Each structure stands twice: as structure tokens, then as C-alpha cells.
Amino acid sequence: MKTVQEKYAFSKSEIKILRELVRGERSLSDLRKKLSFGPSLLSYNLKKLLDKGLIRENTRGFRKYVQFNDSKHASLLKNLLLVYYHIDWENLLVGKGLYILFQIISDFENSFYGVSKATFWRYLRRFRTHGILQKKVNKYEISPRFSILADFLNEYQLFFIKRIAEKLSSEAVVLWHRDFEFLVRVPKTVKVTSEKLHLTATSLFPSLGLPIFSEYNILFHSERKKNIKIEDAVLHTLLIERKNVRYVIYSLLLLHKYKEKIDVGYLKSEAQKYNLGVQIVSMLSFIETHSRQGDLPLPTWTEFEAKAREYGVTV
């Protein structure tokens, strides 16, 4: 079975077809002639672009035509190819190039897992030659001049994430996503068979001795993470709604209940990846000092004590 990364990847042939479509609808015969593609090669690549939600087909008389789809990610890619037509996207958005860009738009340190150093530096040179990437502190980021590229990457990623979620349930709601990892809320009746989906956040609380129940389950989709630790459950609970004090209290209850077992180093490291570093430090301090710091969403100690009694947590 293909990974998500393999499904979103572009080939040079796909980019060449898309370049032809930026100025309008084309017939299949026109594309074959213009690109020197045989019928089977053209058909194969059109099928992949259809699956990516980027194009649509229609038939008039005996001729079949293709054009860009009206979906948000398709419109953004069309504009990107049109505005920056002079850039050789065939050598930038193919292979590991797109994979590297997806990691760059993630809000944490560029680790570039799954990419050899030689491959990374090869693509980095290409991106920087065109001014697409710039370095800020110890991270690479997409230049503001290419904000349309960043917008496309975000929407393209969300397209695939929503597709996975919708296959789970028509009632599935994506709560958070980053680099093809995401949290999704589904009805408890949904049966999960994929090893890439893990029960997490408040849905794990009952098994951890905290009687918090819901008619929905929170699942974490990841192609890298094999199991969910208590620290992960704490962070995923915060990600449900970052500024909601209710979820902060739930996370605090779990942190306090297992404070002797929590791997603080792992917790802080993972928190940085989710832009929750400051929040976690404040929560750990809150547990130790019983007082709030700054304007972060934290309860008063009295409020926390009341919730702790309600859920049977000794404070």
C-alpha cells in the first residue's frame, strides 16, 4: 500500500501536463501532440492528476478535454505555475522536493527525516537558486515572495488529510494537522483497523484512570509514531483547542496524576514540534507552584483543585 507521501508526489510528466493546462482547457489529442506522449502514458498521468483532485475531464462529441479543477489547492497550483511560469517546477516539485517543502512548512525544526543529506542539499540548491527558500535562525522557510507556494502546500496537504478522514466517517472532523500527521474526531461506532491511527487525547483518559467520557473518539494519524505515550496524550489534548481552558485542565489532570512517570525531556521536545513549548513549561510550573504565570490559558489553583476532586485526582 502506498504511503500518503507516495500518493501526493508529482512526476515530471504530471507537471508538464499541468503547465499546458494553466492557460485553459486542452483536448487529449492536443496534449499528446504537444508533449509527445503516447496514449497510455498520457492516460496514466491524467489518472494520477484526477486522483489528486487537480484536474477534471469532460467530453464533447468524440473528443475528450481536460482542465484544472476548481478546488482550492488546484486553483493555487494553477496560479503558481502561471505567475512563475519561468521556473522549472519539473525539477522542484518532483521526487523528494515536495516532501522537503512539506517539512519546511511545518512549524518546528527542519529535521528532514527520510531524506539523505545528498538529496536534501541537491534540492536546497535548486530552491535557493530561485529564491524560494530562505534561512531564518536555524530553520529554512519559504520566502514571503512565494507565499502562494506555501498556501498551495497547506491546501494540498489538507486535501489528502480530509480524504483519509472522510473514509473513516462522514462525520469525521479534522481538529489539527501538520506534515500529514493529524488529529481527527470520529463517532465511537467507527471501527479503526489502520495501524497508522491511534486512540489519543481524552479518548485515552478512561484507560488511564480519568473518567472523562464522550460519544466521540479522538484519533491521531501518523506514519511514524507506533504508539501513544502519556506525554503524547497530554499534548494531543491541548491541540484539540489550544486556548480552551477546559482542555488545559484535562491535560493538567493527566500531568499531575502521572507526574512521577512523565518523561519531562520527551514532553518538552515534542511540545516544541507542536508550538506548545511555552504552554507546557507554564503547566509544569503551575503544578509545582500552584500559581499562574503570564496570560496563558490556565485555571486558578482553586478551579484546578475542584476539577481534580471531581475526577478523583489527588493534588
Label each region the model flagged.
Residues 21-27, 103-112:
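Short capping segments at the starts of secondary-structure elements
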Residues 30-36, 107-116:
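A short acidic, leucine-rich amphipathic alpha-helix
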Residues 36-50, 114-130:
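Short amphipathic alpha-helical interaction segments
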Residues 50-60, 128-138:
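A short, conserved structural fragment
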Residues 59-65, 71, 136-147:
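Short, Lys/Arg-rich nucleic-acid/phosphate-binding segment
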Residues 72-97, 145-180:
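Short, amphipathic alpha-helical interaction segments positioned at domain boundaries
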Residues 158-231:
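Short gly/ser-rich loop at a beta-strand->alpha-helix junction or flexible surface loop bordering the NTP-binding
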Residues 213-315:
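Hydrophobic alpha-helical interaction segments
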